[in-house]
Amino acid sequence: MINVYDTANQLEKDLRESQEYKDLQAVVAKVKADDATFAVYKKLREAQKTLQEQQMQGTLDEKVMKSLQEISQEASQYPLMMELMEKERAISVLIDDLNKIIFKPLSEVYDIEG
């Protein structure tokens, strides 16, 4: 009998070996090594976290949205931040593809058109 946990653990190991993961890991190290970029990175992550918390609570504050837009614009002035966002998009595509594969059996179970 197949143990899906063994498969999942192997997937985790394979993900760590993927080029997308290695690229992301490398650019995060560069961001952390550059004080100015890392400061903007932390500001952006904090603003994103605040926005996400408010969305979950259903209490979206316009000031938080505006602040996030301003910080995002500031971050776009830093080449390393732009590289980071590019690498985040690449790994996000990979993870989305993996999710589609993983959830395919469930999609088939609930498919009302088939």
Swiss-Prot record:
Signal peptide (residue range): none
InterPro entries reported in the protein's UniProt record: Com_YlbF (IPR010368), YheA/YmcA-like_dom_sf (IPR023378)
Gene3D superfamilies: YheA/YmcA-like
Family designation: Belongs to the UPF0342 family.
Protein name: UPF0342 protein LSL_0473
Species: Ligilactobacillus salivarius (strain UCC118) (Lactobacillus salivarius)
